């Protein structure tokens, strides 16, 4: 009796492809980390492993003038911006998902249209408004304040998730005497935690990695720089300490990697369930 080796070969092929893809994405980070532990001279060579492990590079980066200020600014931008986005987007998404009112479809179309609008289209008018009219140039407030008025992508993602919550739960809460606000706070929000977590992570990662925004509004004030923009200061006009640049990059990447590692279950669940019902 001849054995069928096709399932075994398929299993080997799939796992080999998965391992190859994993190595393709992981190896650049390994190279980044190893380079961060090299001396300044060795970082310019083709060596892959440090001759001496220069852990002091991280201390040098940490004590770089302004680095802690960039950390504080980034936490303010990402943390406060994420909080404002969630607070402002949840009520709008709830109304679009669970209320029946005239103009609901038009409102949803406007949200989708806002998602399709390239950010570069509004850069000049937004800069003229925040920097010239309100004189907020040199600060991060032109990036934080707009988040208090909702984000189209966050509203759409939350709306899709809230559609998966059965209306019977809301009807039961209303029968028990709950108003819409109490229903939202006591019934909807606890059930919408995965969707809210996904939106919060998307917004936090966007703000943490944002380079374009701080470059426009805060480039002339080093005290308002964020980590992503502050990394540019490690590049010299004639010489760049690549070991310190790589060490700074690791310190910038580490918080978001750790955050995603601990929140990935809620993130994946929230993103998956947003596509269940339309």
Regions found by a protein language model. Give the residues of each.
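A structural signal for multi-pass alpha-helical bundles of membrane permease subunits
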Residues: 5-6, 10-278
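N-terminal hydrophobic targeting signals that begin at the initiator methionine
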Residues: 1-2
